[in-house]
Structure formats: structure tokens, C-alpha cells
Amino acid sequence: MKIFRHLALMTAVLVPVSMLWGRPVPVRQDTVAAGAGGHDAVGGGCIPVLSLAEEDLAYQAGEHFDFTVHYSWGIINSDVGKASVDLDTMTVDGRKVFHCAVYGKTVSWYDLLFKVREDFQSWFTTDGLVPLRFTRDTREGRYIARNTYNYMRNMPEPHIQADVYSSSSGQRNVELPLDSCTYDLPALFFLARNMDFDAVTPGVRYPMTFAIDDDVYNVYFILLGRETRKIKGLGHVRTIKFAAKLLAGEVFTGEEDMLIWVSDDDNRIPLMFEAPILVGTASGRLSGWSGLKHPFSSLVRSQGRQ
């Protein structure tokens, strides 16, 4: 039955960064400077990004993405989950902010084995992409988890005020550490799309911190280069390829990097990922989109949408 849970978690993994959760291990100081996956150098500070002024961002309110999660292991080779990402704007305390809604679910046949529903909501500033609030509502089989985060930046010691519930541990109110490189997963997803690849050194690991449940975790981004790749349902696309390194945990092996391809155009669309998990390999691909800010100019030969 554990394999079903692994796949369920991968349905959630697809989206915020296309991909960044799944019960990793909390960050330890001795792991931050250690080489991993063949990438030894660690860049200082947060990932380099382009201008975060609203008019310069890679996206706009009204953008929508659909994704499909696929699993392969031996004779098993099937789509197991769907996910969507929507971005809009709203007014909070008199201030215009972005609101991101991320939904993930297992497909109907997989519901019979292990039903999953994921709902992530994030609010962050339109200028600077500063996280303000985050909620999570997760159901994985009989397991339930809910998070509510408020970012307390104006306190003597900035922190995330986290109201966390799980069906296994009950209700908890905790304070999570907060610095300028700490994001919730949807906010990190949108920050990463503004990465300045011209300022990134290939092969160097750039650390970021994300919060989920009652802890914070490190993820490392590694630029690998550019390539034209054929993606099922899309066609041939010019892409920027990079890796995300996560620490080993319940789903990820920690031995290999998750590979991510984004469009090599002004949209920086997340197109595809591949990730080795403890049993088999999971992948995700873009299956639908609308409301792009810029032309999808990296799509050089289209197969039409699935």
C-alpha cells in the first residue's frame, strides 16, 4: 500500500516548483555545504532573479496551467494524477496582491486505490513576490493535513506563525524561522520562474528554503543548460534545463536530482519534470495553458494540446 501513497505524494509534488514537497527530511547544517549529486559548489544567498517589479515578471493575473502526473515502474506506465495552477490578483488590507490556487488530485481509477486531493493557496505581493499568507488542505487516503501560515515580518524576530493540523498529530501552533530566502511552495514556484539564468553558474547549487507543515526544508537549484526537447502533447520546445536537489525522505531517494524543463522564452513555463522516487520514476508534463503574458515563442513545432 505504501507505493500508492508515494504516487499520491508525487501528485502533490508536481506543482509548486512543479514539484517540491513529498515528506523530505528537515535541513541540517552539515548538509548545506556538502556536495550532492555531483554538484559540489554552493552559491551564496538566494537564487539570482530578474527584476521582481510587477511589469517585469514572467506572468500576469489570469494565467492558468494544467499538468499531468505520470508513473512508470516495470510494466506499469500510466497517468495517475492531475494538477492545476491559477494566478489572479485581489486586494488585501488595501494592497493589491497575487493569489495563487494550486489543486492536485488522483485520476478516477487511482482513487479506488488511494484517493488524493490537494489544495494549496498562497498570497504574495505583486512587487517583490513577498509571501504574506499560505493555506494547505490535504487529503491522502485517510490522512488529513491543514496548514495556515501568516508571515510575521515586522516582529523583533521575524517568523512564520503556523497553525498546523494533521490527523496523525492533531492541532499545533508553531513559529517557523523566516528569512529573505524562505517561501511557501506556490510562492517559490513563481519566484523560480523569474530566475536570472544569465547570472547563474552552471553546476553550482543555489539553496532556497521552503516551509511546509511544521518545518522548513532546503532545496537546491542547479542550472544544466539549454536543449530542444520533445514533450508529449506539446511538440518540440526550446527549454532551459535545471535540477532541483532535495534531501532524502519518504518519497525521494536523495541520490539523484529532479530534472526540470522550463520554456526558453519570456514566460518561463514549467513544461516537464522527471524524478526518481523510492519505487519507480514519476514525471509530470504541461497539458494545458491560457492567459500567458508573452507569446509561447519557444514552441518550435506543435503537436497540439492533449
Go through the PLM ranges and name each one.
Residues 23-153, 196-306:
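Acidic, serine/threonine-rich low-complexity disordered tracts
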Residues 1-6:
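Positively charged n-region of N-terminal signal peptides that target proteins for export
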Residues 8-18:
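Bacterial N-terminal signal peptides
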Residues 155-212:
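Active-site/ligand-binding surface loops and adjacent short beta/alpha elements
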